[in-house]
């Protein structure tokens, strides 16, 4: 009887593989590819917070937060890192607000960046699907989910109610996209805004537009918020920003990366490197003074950052020691994972 069941199972498996290709079904113990490669985020502190040294390939990432908190900056740094490694990047600008000059300052090669400014949400998501399905794009950024307006809403009159249209659009698109994203090992970053629920007395009233589907399909969700202003004298030169890993299916979540987002420069690599070097006792901090290998490098954090910027050899040496202390490489990495599974939502 047992032999009959085994023969029937073998026949069924062969039929499935014949119809749908090799690898369509397999025993979990036989699965060879239990590894996932990652792309650096462009921020050493964020790479550490993500737990795997960057964004995992073939996964969906949601970056959300208040206005002007640095969401697009986080995504542009990821694009710059992909391009540094010789990859291809696409930016779907549904908000029609991308600043090419700012992107260039962050290290993005705007000559090679694929840019689309869709008229409707359906068009934007169809373009994203076509790019992902091609298998020739390494990262696709959609900015933003809130700006992916359904065609019916654009064609309608001001004041018309379209209940759940955007949520259904996102749910349908993600069902289609998630498989091809995983198959082609493309990173999809969805930037999202926040809204407030009306009449909430207890708990967090904040929510993100586009329904619940994106929350479920995302492997990583990042919350970006400004913590404080950075000043040089009386001039405001940037913001201290907290990036919280709210959800992570490839490493422990709820870690926080604190970075300096400087106006016109993006994430300050010197600032985060200095903080992490002090934390690992690679750079000594005594009062307001910072010292490396017994030599003082600056009084006050901004002076120490400037010193590191002007002495690139020392900065590279400190960076190598910090990366070694945290166990993070300098480029694309491959890690072994145990991925948690989640129940996917019904249409909203």
Swiss-Prot record:
Q: Which InterPro entries match?
A: AAA+_ATPase (IPR003593), DNA_recomb/repair_RecA (IPR013765), DNA_recomb/repair_RecA_CS (IPR020584), P-loop_NTPase (IPR027417), RecA-like_C (IPR049261), RecA-like_N (IPR049428), RecA_ATP-bd (IPR020588), RecA_C_sf (IPR023400)
Q: Name one GO cellular component term.
A: cytosol
Q: Which SMART domains match?
A: AAA
**Pfam families from the UniProt entry:** RecA (PF00154), RecA_C (PF21096)
Give the superkingdom in one word: Bacteria
Q: What is its main location?
A: cytoplasm
Q: Quote the CDD domains the UniProt record gives.
A: RecA
Q: Which GO terms describe its biological process?
A: DNA recombination; DNA repair; SOS response
Where does the UniProt annotation locate this protein?
Answer: Cytoplasm
Record GO terms (molecular function): ATP binding; ATP hydrolysis activity; ATP-dependent DNA damage sensor activity; damaged DNA binding; single-stranded DNA binding
UniProt-annotated binding residues for ATP: 65-72
Q: Which UniProt keywords apply?
A: ATP-binding, Cytoplasm, DNA damage, DNA recombination, DNA repair, DNA-binding, Nucleotide-binding, SOS response
Q: State its role.
A: Can catalyze the hydrolysis of ATP in the presence of single-stranded DNA, the ATP-dependent uptake of single-stranded DNA by duplex DNA, and the ATP-dependent hybridization of homologous single-stranded DNAs. It interacts with LexA causing its activation and leading to its autocatalytic cleavage.
Q: Which family does it belong to?
A: Belongs to the RecA family.
PANTHER family given in the database record = MITOCHONDRIAL DNA REPAIR PROTEIN RECA HOMOLOG-RELATED, RECA
- Please report the name of this protein according to its UniProt entry: Protein RecA
What species is this protein from? Enterococcus gallinarum
Top-level taxonomy: Bacteria, Bacillati, Bacillota, Bacilli, Lactobacillales
């Amino acid at each position: 009887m047992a032999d009959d069941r085994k023969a029937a199972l073998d026949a069924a498996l062969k039929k499935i593989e014949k119809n749908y290709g090799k690898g369509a079904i397999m025993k979990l113990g036989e699965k060879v590819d239990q590894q996932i490669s990652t792309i650096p985020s462009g921020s050493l502190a964020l790479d550490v917070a993500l737990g795997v040294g960057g964004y995992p390939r073939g996964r969906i990432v949601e970056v959300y937060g208040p206005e002007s908190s640095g969401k697009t900056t986080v995504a542009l740094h990821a694009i710059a890192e992909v391009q540094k490694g010789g990859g291809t990047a696409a930016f779907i600008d549904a908000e029609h607000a991308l600043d090419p000059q700012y992107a260039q300052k962050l290290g993005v090669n705007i000559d090679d960046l694929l840019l689309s400014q869709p008229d409707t949400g359906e068009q934007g998501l169809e373009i994203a699907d076509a790019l992902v399905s091609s298998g020739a794009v390494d990262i696709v950024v959609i900015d933003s989910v809130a700006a992916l307006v359904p065609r019916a809403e654009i064609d309608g009159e001001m004041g018309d109610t379209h209940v759940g249209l955007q949520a259904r659009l996102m749910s349908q698109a993600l069902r289609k996209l998630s498989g091809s994203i995983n198959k082609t090992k493309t990173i999809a970053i969805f930037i999202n805004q926040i809204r407030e629920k009306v009449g909430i007395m207890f708990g967090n009233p904040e929510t993100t537009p586009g329904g619940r589907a994106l929350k479920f399909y995302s492997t990583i969700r990042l919350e970006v918020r400004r913590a404080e202003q950075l000043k040089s004298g009386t001039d405001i030169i940037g913001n201290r920003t907290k990036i919280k890993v709210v959800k992570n299916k490839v490493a422990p979540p709820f870690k926080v990366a604190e970075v300096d987002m400087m106006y016109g420069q993006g994430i300050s690599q010197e600032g985060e490197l200095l903080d992490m070097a002090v934390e690992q006792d690679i750079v000594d901090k005594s009062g307001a003074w910072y010292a490396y290998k017994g030599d003082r490098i600056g009084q006050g954090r901004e002076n120490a950052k400037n010193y590191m910027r002007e002495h690139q050899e020392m900065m590279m040496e400190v960076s190598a020691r910090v990366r070694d202390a945290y166990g993070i490489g300098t480029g694309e990495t491959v890690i072994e994972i145990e991925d948690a599974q989640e129940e996917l939502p019904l249409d909203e």
